[in-house]
Structure formats: C-alpha cells, structure tokens
C-alpha cells in the first residue's frame, strides 16, 4: 500500500494520488486529490468524473456460452457438480483484460475429475485473465467438458434477451464496468471570497485496470465529450416573435447515417439505447412511443419524420442534438476498426 501526506497547493491546479493499494487480484483501490479549486468547481468535476468512471469506461466480459446437447439452462450434466445455470453465473464473474474491438471466440476443453478454473479458458491473444483461480465448475467423474465462449468489449450493463437455445448456446448478462465504485468528497479552506476547495476522489476497480488508469480513461472520455463544442460552427439560430422558437439549419439524420453505413458500423449503433442519454422525459417518452429505442432507430429518421410525431416540436429536435452530443457519437465509437 502506498500512502502520501496531502499537501495543498495554492498555485497551479494539480492532481496527485495520495493512496494506492491492491486488496486482491480483483479489487484495487486508489484515492486522488485535485486542488486548488474555486468554490463549486469540486462538485462539478466530482459528479462528472464519477459518472464517467462508472458509465464511460469499457470492459471485457464473457457474453455467451455454448454447451453440447444441453436441453435448457437449468439442466444438470452427469459428472458435473454444478448445473448449467450455475456454470453460466460463474463465467459471468470472470474478470478479463483486453484491447480487442468487437467480439472474439474462446473455449474450455477439460477432462475430469477436477476443478475447472479461469486458467482452463483458451483465450485469443488480445485477451488475458486477471485472476486464474476464479472457480467455474467441479468435475466429479472422468468426463470431457467442452464449452464454446464468446467474449465482447463494451461499456455499461447489457441484459441478454433469451432466444432459441436449441443449439446449446446461452447468453450471459454482462457487466462491462471495470470500475466497481467511485466516490468524491470536498474539503473547503480559506475565508470569504478567497475560499477554495480540494476534491478527493476514491476509485475501486476489478483489477482489469488500476484506479489511475481508470481516472485517465474517464478524463479522456470527458474531454472527448466537450471537444465538439470547441470546434462547432456558429449555429444558424434566430429568435422570432416567440423567444423560445428556434429555427434549425437543414439537416437529416438519415444523411448522417449513410456515411456510417459505408463503414459498416450499424451493429454498434443498435447497441446504443436512447436511455443512455439525458433526454427530457417528454421527448424520451415520445420517441419510445414511436418505437425509437436505439441510436440506429433515431438516425434512420429525418427531421420531417420526427416532426410528424404527435406533440413533437422543432425545439425537441434541437434538444436531441444537444443531449446526444451527436458529434461524439459519430467520431468516437465508430472510427476504430
């Protein structure tokens, strides 16, 4: 464990790691400070950073497992102590580290008797296991166990929709969140107008990356979110009789989608749900009512299509562009191969 005495700077804004430790292979802890900040800035940064740490950082998980000749998820296999469901739950807990894009295949092929652990997983070269001792199953008889696995890198929490299991393939709910928890606290010092703040940020990770790495990645993601505002062209907005009435330059969501089709990224668009964006409740409910659930659905609509929806206004179109931070959606997740 590393611990340093906190020293407050009164000059240039700076951050420092004041505590760092590894409680286990799958639990890392780090505490950081940022100072000096003006009154109110610590809370602004702390809230944004916590949300970025918990929701914007990508992780790698096992998302599907395929067994041979298994009728359903709650089946038992002769010679294996656990049911198929219990094995799936154990696979869900496996912590992986990778730099892959998209999905990869992996497998388990072992012969009993004996315990099956994470070290028995045959992985692609771009993926590694954080803790080889993680338990999967116990083979009580000399049988062969072969499981095909699918590995994905993504972010957030994905609940898999059950489909046809006749091929023995079972989806696994995936938690693509390498940061287990993040907290922030504020210490104020000084008097009157000279009052300043220190931001304390605590980060716990699952071992697939360190708290310091998580802090760097979350910071980069936050910066990427705001870059479009720095380079945005001056909007062609003007007020008419009603000061809240907004006229937008001509555009269509469909035109922008055409460019994405050229890069064959529609699958990624379908995995981004409008729930992930902070749309006003009225706008959100209106989109859901017309079966617009994902970014792909939304980008497939023109401005005219949206305006035909009941109770939908031109101000709502503008709000969608602002809330979705559309430039990040086009230039960040879909430009990598």
Swiss-Prot record:
Chain intervals for the UniProt region annotation (Alpha C-terminal domain (alpha-CTD)): 267-337
Enzyme class at the top of the EC tree: transferase
GO molecular function: DNA binding; DNA-directed RNA polymerase activity; protein dimerization activity
Species for this entry: Eucalyptus globulus subsp. globulus
Entry keyword annotation includes Nucleotidyltransferase: yes
Domain notes from UniProt: The N-terminal domain is essential for RNAP assembly and basal transcription, whereas the C-terminal domain is involved in interaction with transcriptional regulators and with upstream promoter elements.
UniProt lineage: Eukaryota, Viridiplantae, Streptophyta, Embryophyta, Tracheophyta
Enzyme Commission (EC) number: 2.7.7.6
Main location: plastid
Recorded catalytic activity of this chain's protein: RNA(n) + a ribonucleoside 5'-triphosphate = RNA(n+1) + diphosphate
Gene name as annotated: rpoA
CC terms in the record's Gene Ontology section: chloroplast; DNA-directed RNA polymerase complex; mitochondrion
Alphabetical list of SMART domains matching this protein: RPOLD (SM00662)
Source species, domain of life: Eukaryota
Compartmental location: Plastid, Chloroplast
Function noted in UniProt: DNA-dependent RNA polymerase catalyzes the transcription of DNA into RNA using the four ribonucleoside triphosphates as substrates.
Region (Alpha N-terminal domain (alpha-NTD)): 1-233
Tagged with keyword Nucleotidyltransferase: yes
UniProt subunit comment: In plastids the minimal PEP RNA polymerase catalytic core is composed of four subunits: alpha, beta, beta', and beta''. When a (nuclear-encoded) sigma factor is associated with the core the holoenzyme is formed, which can initiate transcription.
Family (UniProt): Belongs to the RNA polymerase alpha chain family.
Name of the molecule in the record: DNA-directed RNA polymerase subunit alpha
């Amino acid at each position: 464990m590393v611990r340093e005495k906190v020293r407050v700077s009164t000059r240039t804004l700076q951050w420092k790691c004041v505590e760092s430790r590894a409680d286990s292979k799958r639990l890392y802890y780090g505490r950081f400070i940022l100072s000096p900040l003006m009154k109110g800035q610590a809370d602004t940064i702390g809230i944004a950073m916590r949300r970025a740490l918990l929701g914007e950082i990508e992780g790698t998980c096992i998302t599907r497992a395929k067994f041979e000749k298994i009728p359903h998820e709650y089946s038992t296999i002769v010679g294996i102590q656990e049911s198929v469901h219990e094995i799936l739950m154990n696979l869900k807990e496996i912590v992986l580290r990778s730099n892959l894009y998209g999905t990869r295949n992996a497998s388990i092929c072992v012969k009993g008797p004996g315990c099956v652990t994470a070290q028995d997983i045959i992985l692609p070269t771009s993926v590694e296991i954080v803790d080889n001792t993680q338990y999967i199953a116990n083979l009580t008889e000399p049988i062969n166990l072969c499981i095909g696995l699918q590995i994905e890198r993504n972010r957030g929490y994905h609940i898999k929709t059950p489909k046809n299991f006749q091929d023995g393939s079972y989806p696994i709910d995936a938690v693509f969140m390498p940061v287990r928890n993040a907290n922030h606290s504020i210490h104020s010092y000084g008097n009157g107008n000279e009052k300043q703040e220190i931001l304390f940020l605590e980060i716990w990770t699952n071992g697939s990356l360190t708290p310091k790495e998580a802090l760097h990645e979350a910071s980069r993601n936050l910066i990427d979110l705001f870059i479009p505002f720095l380079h945005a062209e001056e909007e062609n907005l003007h007020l008419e009789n009603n000061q809240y009435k907004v006229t937008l330059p001509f555009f269509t969501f469909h035109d922008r989608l055409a460019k994405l089709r050229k890069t064959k990224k529609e699958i990624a668009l379908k995995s981004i749900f409008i729930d992930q964006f902070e749309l006003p409740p009225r706008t959100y409910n209106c989109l859901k009512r017309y079966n617009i659930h994902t970014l792909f659905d939304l980008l497939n609509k023109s401005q005219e299509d949206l305006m035909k929806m009941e109770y939908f206004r031109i101000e709502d179109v503008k709000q969608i562009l602002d809330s979705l931070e559309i430039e990040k959606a086009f230039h960040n997740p879909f430009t990598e191969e």
